[in-house]
Amino acid sequence: MVCTPVEKSPNLLPTTSKANSKAGLAPLLLTVVELIRQLMEAQVIRRMEQDCLSESELEQASESLQKLEEQVLNLCHIFEIEPADLNINLGDVGTLLPSPGSYYPGEIGNKPSVLELLDRLLNTGIVVDGEIDLGLAQLNLIHAKLRLVLTSRPL
């Protein structure tokens, strides 16, 4: 089988940049990065309130979080993605991220989000144990036995 690059063909329809911003990996990856950024921000707030961070650590963390947020917004601009579109509505489960200003770590929000659940799990700690078989065409190609410890505390 020979693979050749796709050439410009009259049969291919050009896509608009708006259509491209809804497809591909960029929106998904930016959503994951934003979720992780907000989780880290919640952990910094929790540690700050527990006086577990020095002034320099707090300053470094806040500067890093601010730069990461700027990069997410910059990449949204480059890929023509509305930052609000990073918050996925998961139906009955709620939204992936809380609406701006509606969640503060340690407090119960009006409309819980997946981020709030993950933040609480990190704060409490959880162990997930299981097996995964990955494959295709009815072939199990990868077998994994996993134990995941999810916590914000040192192990």
From Swiss-Prot:
Its main location: other. GO terms for molecular function: structural molecule activity. It is found in: Gas vesicle. GO terms for cellular component: gas vesicle; vesicle membrane. Coiled coil: none annotated. Pfam families: Gas_vesicle (PF00741), GvpK (PF05121). InterPro entries: Gas-vesicle_GvpA-like (IPR000638), GvpK (IPR007805). One of its GO terms (biological process) is gas vesicle organization. It comes from the Bacteria. Belongs to the gas vesicle GvpK family. This is Gas vesicle protein K. It comes from Nostoc sp. (strain PCC 7120 / SAG 25.82 / UTEX 2576). The gene is gvpK.
